[in-house]
Amino acid sequence: MSNTGTTGRIPLWLVGTVVGLLAIGLLALFFYGSYSGLGSSL
């Protein structure tokens, strides 16, 4: 496993962290919307 993919690019751990936070945020918004009745129409 060479480390050439991260050269001059965003580190993979940072990408994973951002994607994870976005996924958790979207899930939180979806559950909050469905709980408050805003997401019941989806």
From Swiss-Prot:
The record describes its membrane topology as:
Single-pass membrane protein
Q: Which SUPFAM superfamilies match?
A: Photosystem II reaction center protein J, PsbJ
Keywords of the record = Chloroplast, Membrane, Photosynthesis, Photosystem II, Plastid, Reaction center, Thylakoid, Transmembrane, Transmembrane helix
**What are the record's GO terms for cellular component?**
chloroplast thylakoid membrane; photosystem II reaction center
What Pfam families does the record tag this protein with?
A: PsbJ
Which one GO biological process term can you cite for this protein? Answer: photosynthesis
Task: Report the subcellular localization.
Answer: Plastid, Chloroplast thylakoid membrane
Asked whether the UniProt record includes Transport among its keywords, one would answer no
What residue ranges are annotated as transmembrane?
A: 10-30
Q: Keyword Plastid: yes or no?
A: yes
Q: Which domain of life is it from?
A: Eukaryota
Family membership: Belongs to the PsbJ family.
**Function of the protein:** One of the components of the core complex of photosystem II (PSII). PSII is a light-driven water:plastoquinone oxidoreductase that uses light energy to abstract electrons from H(2)O, generating O(2) and a proton gradient subsequently used for ATP formation. It consists of a core antenna complex that captures photons, and an electron transfer chain that converts photonic excitation into a charge separation.
On assembly, the entry states: PSII is composed of 1 copy each of membrane proteins PsbA, PsbB, PsbC, PsbD, PsbE, PsbF, PsbH, PsbI, PsbJ, PsbK, PsbL, PsbM, PsbT, PsbX, PsbY, PsbZ, Psb30/Ycf12, at least 3 peripheral proteins of the oxygen-evolving complex and a large number of cofactors. It forms dimeric complexes.
Q: What is the protein's name according to its record?
A: Photosystem II reaction center protein J
Q: Which organism is it from?
A: Mesostigma viride (Green alga)
